[in-house]
Amino acid sequence: MFALTDKVIGNLQMATFAAFGGFATLVLSSFAGTRREKLAAHAALAVAGSVLLTIGTAVTSSTALAAIVTLPVTFAVFFAGIAGPNAASGSTGALLAYVLPAASPGTISMVPDRLAGWWLASIAGTAAVLALSPRPGEDRLRADASQLAAGLADLLDAALGGAATEARLGDAMAAKHELITRFTATPYRPTGLATPDEALANIVELLEWCTTLVADTIRERADLRNASRQERDLLEAAGSVLHDVATLLADGRTVPDLDRLERCRAESLAWLGQLTPERPGFRAAARLSFHADTIAGVVLATGAAALVARGLADPEWIATTRSRWHHGPATARLQRPRRRILSLAAVARRDASVRSVWFISSLRGAIALAAAVAVADLSSVQHGFWVVLGALSVLRTNAASTGSTALRALAGTAIGFVIGGALLVAIGSDSTALWVALPIAVFVAAYAPGTAPFAIGQAAFTVTIAVLFNLLAPVGWKVGVLRIEDVAIGCAVSVLAGILFWPRGLSSLVGDDLADTFRAGASYLTQAIEWASGSRTGEPDGGTATITAALRLDDALRAFLTEQGTKHIGKQELWRLVGGSMRLRLTAHLVAGLPRDATGMGAARDALSHRTGTLVAWYERLAELVGKPRGKPVADLEPPAFGPVDVVKVGSGSHYGIWLCEHLDHLSEGLDELVPPASRLAEIRRRPWWR
């Protein structure tokens, strides 16, 4: 396209935007999914780029106007990444269509030529992607989820047959770790806003928790041959559904029998209700019933999510499930386009907070780029575009990592200048040699990101630009010197923005979001226990807040783990804290869905209330530990201690109260493991940001 527009058509504006449009389409943006999904993503990039290009050209005549308009425009582009991985991956390419005209001289009359170049590059680039991209490989995330579901089903079958072993349990735990590692290996949540994507994300979370529940059951009672018929039937039905989920996720069409699992669960609860608390072995039976019912509840949700993920549930049921995840019953029967709009609006509301990594990163990026546009114009550099691109290329989530990246960017640019300058001196004015060198330079620049160090990518890009600009307007090696100067200015702007607006970056946000998840989960647990024990008249309504906090934490943690620089805290320590918050939230969710007993609790209600209060107070202290330091030293935190008043006694006469107490008892296990990583995070938050 560059050769066509430069040599055949002979239009400088068209050639420039064809060249950089190709970079935006093929180098800066990488879309995943099927060919249809890639086509839709590239089409959206082309349309968005056209709008941004027009706006950028319109504001370039005024420094103040360009800087002011850059703030909302770049914020909107960055923030649009909440829609999914492809939207996030296309943000830099879309911004290139804006910053190139906004930071370069031009008039509104140039818009048609620039759009023509942009669309030529978009069409050619999209065609190349669709024609030359390899066939989509196996969906490894779905495959890993299928493998874990099958492993859990086999483990339950083995326990029912008295053949559960530590080796089988170890295999299941290894499969869980592999699934979570793959799910968390990308900077963006590997699912979008579509209902099947949401369902797959839920499956990952549910299977992780189900693994913990099954492991706890096996470790407590590995041989279930002597369990009651009702509990055996329930666990056998749960294993059958897990087998069907595994087949379904592996492209099968088997529909899990959720109705049978529901019936077995109801029979198990009814059987437990017929037992008297004074009966020998009642507490052991109640504990096994708790394990079986908890596993069944999680497996039911997993089976439902699998049906949605594979598109086998009817639209009405999908809508109801979707509303339960994000909105509420009011949106259950809306038509699909409107549900899509409301879903986007709900996610936007969720992330419109200083607790959201999307909001804070978008705001910081917008301020840095607006400042870069203003500095580029006021400093009268020859190529202001490079100032803005320099700022964009080194933006990171904290000042220290931005500064580190800035140094690598300058080093890479200097290396590229030396190589490019030597190449131009050797080639001289031979345009044929430059045309031969251009595709080689482009190949290296496109291949380097993700496969070579950041500085190497910067060097390759500088060589490409040196060759490209000498084809457009021969100036020899001087273009390299100019780019070093401009990139240095842009890097300085990004570093300054990082110091002023977000010096600590994501480490502080991860702590704040962890605190929010623990507080929201503790509040939801209180509501759930009060509802199930009959002391609350209204149904629990804290579920939405816990989901919002969990999703914000997920986004912040992904960005933190993919951020360059020293972390000072291990990934496993962070995931132990995240797992603790998830266990709290899902326990509250499960209790909130249990039958309500408003009359038969008796003295058990006071014990449950006291035990819940002790747990909630501990989670509040944990949230305070990982939250904002507020000038306080790191406080010692001991696991909660429960006294006689916190235990529902067998003599209370309430089998349901004893059963609910098992939920709280299970949640209390392992809380001491959360203290060391929480204290470590608290210490990090109290260090100076530059350390």
Where are these regions (language model features)?
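Alpha-helical transmembrane segments and their membrane-interface boundaries
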Residues: 1-128, 132-133, 303-459, 465, ...
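Long, hydrophobic alpha-helical segments that serve as membrane-spanning/inserting helices
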Residues: 4, 8, 30-31, 132-370, ...
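Active-site acid/base region of carbohydrate-active enzymes
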Residues: 497
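Active-site-adjacent mobile loop/cap segments within catalytic or ligand-binding domains
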Residues: 579
